[in-house]
Amino acid sequence: MKLAVQHFSHSSEIDIRVWESLENRIFYHQANFSDAEGYSVLKAYLEQLDQQYGTQGNRLFYLSTPPDYFQEIIRNLNRHQLFYHEQGAQQPWSRLIIEKPFGVNLETARELQQCIDANIDEESVYRIDHYLGKETVQNILTIRFANTLFESCWNSQYIDHVQISVSESIGIGSRGNFFEKSGMLRDMVQNHLTQLLCLLTMEPPSEFFSEEIKKEKIKILKKILPIREEDAVRGQYGEGIVQDVSVLGYREEENVDPNSSVETYVALKLFIDNPRWKGVPFYLQAGKRLPKRTTDIAVIFKKSSYNLFNAENCPLCPLENDLLIIRIQPDEGVALQFNCKVPGTNKLVRPVKMDFRYDSYFNTVTPEAYERLLCDCILGDRTLFTSNEEVLASWELFSPLLEKWSQVRPIFPNYMAGSLRPQEADELLSRDGKAWRPY
């Protein structure tokens, strides 16, 4: 375990004294999820450790398990009194972390929530989305609401469109069984990309607290218009070359149906029906086996309307759209592109870029997303965790599209591993006179 910590830690080295104090408090207990007796033994073992080390009975249960076991584990933890239902300032606490997926559609999400409601208090549930633990994602609200430069033009009057892109060069690896039940829309879009969209578009909360932020995100989710089938593209990679390595197509991967209709790429065009965003298209894309690993948000502003820079007055001034790029991974940071005069006697205008990177500006190591989120859970801070209302509102948006897709068998594969995306995804934007930004 020490070697693993050394390998994955962002810190340059581990303080051996700190590690030894932690190592002596790590214990392993094995049981079967379905074995009722195992939970009784676990309860007795935890109580023994409480007495031995004076840990006062605090419990954090992290269900990093196959989602099929969530409800069974939750019921058994409650049945064997491993959850506390009366938690005050001077009393021990019990908390539950659940990994996505939170259901596979609206119906199953409601079933999971019914199980949660019957067994543990909602305030003790932490639905983890590791994207919300990334430093740049947390910075979105600060960029927006702490800077008049951006918030004053953060609306349909000045913004042409927005692109949110998640590109992964990897395939599904050994996750074939899981991915066959999920697909890219459930695995990435319904949660990660939707959370980014909410933070990018929500109204300012009355206070910078967990519940107020969640209220504004839910309002946005409920204002997203139903997704039209013609505004959604799905794809699946075939064999190809990624970073000079030949790779299999999705249907040839381990534990994948050779005739699978599961999507490994999704592109969507969404609209938000409120005064701030009316008419602004939001383009979302996420895919596997693309050329490189990157996640970013691009806010594309409208071109200047001043006649000073039209073709007649300034033929050498082909203005580009101003851009705000929020890089989530790799190289977390923010870049601003704007038009500037080229030095010299001619009236030449070219786009230039100002680029901020966390690792070069701040003399500190950015913690891993999970590191921040686990710490918040221990402290009882739910700000960066997803609420049940957000989960259900998101499924209300995407479940109808998934149902439509299930009724029509797609022609797959429709993009090569290592290529940019399916042709249909390019056409989704070209119909609007736009194009995807480079990864």
UniProtKB/Swiss-Prot annotation:
Describe which pathway this protein belongs to, using the record's wording. Answer: Carbohydrate degradation; pentose phosphate pathway; D-ribulose 5-phosphate from D-glucose 6-phosphate (oxidative stage): step 1/3
Q: Name one GO molecular function term.
A: glucose-6-phosphate dehydrogenase activity
* Family to which the UniProt record says this protein belongs: Belongs to the glucose-6-phosphate dehydrogenase family.
Keyword annotations of the record: Carbohydrate metabolism, Glucose metabolism, NADP, Oxidoreductase
Its function, per the record, reads: Catalyzes the oxidation of glucose 6-phosphate to 6-phosphogluconolactone.
Q: What is this protein called?
A: Glucose-6-phosphate 1-dehydrogenase
> What's its EC?
1.1.1.49
Establish whether keyword NADP is in the entry: yes
UniProt xrefs under HAMAP family: G6PD
Catalytic positions are 192
* GO terms for cellular component: cytosol
| Protein species of origin | Chlamydia trachomatis serovar D (strain ATCC VR-885 / DSM 19411 / UW-3/Cx)
Look up the record and give one Gene Ontology term from the biological process aspect. Answer: glucose metabolic process
Bilayer-spanning residue ranges: none
